[in-house]
Amino acid sequence: MNKACHFNTQELLKVDEAVKVSEELINNYFKMSSGQWLKNRYDIKTAKDLADHENVEGPFAQVIKYEGRKKDATLGSSSFSFYKVCLQDSAILSAVSKTDSLFLEPFLLYILTHELVHVVRFLKFKQRYENKNEADVTLDEERRVHFITHKILKPVPILRLNQVFEFYKDWILFEKS
């Protein structure tokens, strides 16, 4: 993987905006207030801030679980799950450059919303975290998360978002009851 390919300053501004919008959409969809537990239980990083093991080939992002503990806490009962959303700049930029119909802003919004759906499902125990990376997540679970992501984003009037839905059309299937 080409580790030299990172988001530039303008692209990072687009990432920041997509993070804000996706967080708001996630909070609204899952009926969480901005002050609830989710705010401090995850972080979003781009390639330049990732450790070597957090960079992967293939997916556009991955969620990695870490164990957090408050300062001066020695008991295991004081630990908590902390999730890091690791954006893979190179894969995202490559997909956008190779696919005429994809534009960075709506693509980032979809990716970030998708990853935050995973985080919420992990934190609410709707999905078990026992996988090392996104590629290990079961196909059924991945399709379920794409379905939820589509459900969250469909009513949002974002220019060129339909092209992103088209890009993911094989993943966005109706959820089985």
Language-model regions: role of each:
Residues 1-80:
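A metal-dependent hydrolase signature that marks the N-terminal structural subdomain at the beginning
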Residues 2-9, 16-20, 150, 154-177:
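Long, well-structured alpha-helical subdomains associated
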Residues 78-87, 115-116:
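Short coil-to-beta-strand
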Residues 86-92, 122:
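Short loop/turn segments at strand-loop or loop-helix junctions that form parts
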Residues 91-112:
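Short pre-active-site segment immediately N-terminal to the catalytic Zn-binding motif
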Residues 91-96, 135, 140, 161-165:
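Conserved binding/catalytic microenvironments
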Residues 106-107, 121-151:
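Post-HEXXH active-site segment of zinc metalloproteases
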Residues 111, 115-123:
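Catalytic glutamate of the conserved HExxH
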